[in-house]
Amino acid sequence: MIEKLKSVEEKFENINAQLCDPDVVSDIEKYKTLMQEAKHLTPVVEKYREYKKVNADFEEAQALLDEGGLDKDFREMVQEQFEQSRDDLEKIKEELKILLLPRDP
């Protein structure tokens, strides 16, 4: 799933770059097609970027917990962040699965 999301994000970035090209802007049909595709990809890319941020938070919390040597209060705070990030990741993964489903024609 992650490879698919990386591919979608790359495609989105490519489309956005094309939309800035004066040749594309002057070709109304191509511009319209690219805008529609960008509109379709935007929710997937936004959710994927959210996933990457939450995953980084999760990994950071996990690394801190694995290090040990944390005082009790800080460890509790990191543990809460770890659990919240883990729960958020599961939710985001489910949302991404839905967003990646083929759309109806």
Predicted regions and their residues:
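Charged, heptad-repeat coiled-coil alpha-helices that serve as long linker/dimerization "arms"
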Residues: M1-P105
